[in-house]
Amino acid sequence: MAWKKIAEKGEIVIGKGKAFKIDNKQIAIFNQDGYHAIDDLCVHQDGSIAPGKLEGDIVECPLHFWHYNIKTGELKDYLKDVKLATYHVETRNDGIYVDI
C-alpha cells in the first residue's frame, strides 16, 4: 500500500462525507471525530454512501437506508459479516492522505 493525497484540509465538511476516485477505487472520506475512509459502495445496489446521513459513526446509504460503521466498514443491518474495506487516513500539513 502507498500513501496518496486525496483532499485538501477543510475540503470535507465536519459531519459529512465526500467521494473520491483514486487508483481506480471509489473511496468515501468522512469527517466525523477525525477522518475515516471506506469503500464508497453500498453492497445492496452499488450506490455511493459518501452523501449519506451521518449519525455518530454510522452512515446511512441514501438509496435504500442501509447502515455502515465509518470506522470499521461493518454493515449494521440486514446481512451479517459484511464489511466494506477501510483505509488508514493521515492529516498532514499539505492535506489529507489515504493509505491505498
Predicted regions and their residues:
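Short cysteine/histidine-rich metal-coordination sites, predominantly Zn2+-binding motifs
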Residues: 56-62, 76-84
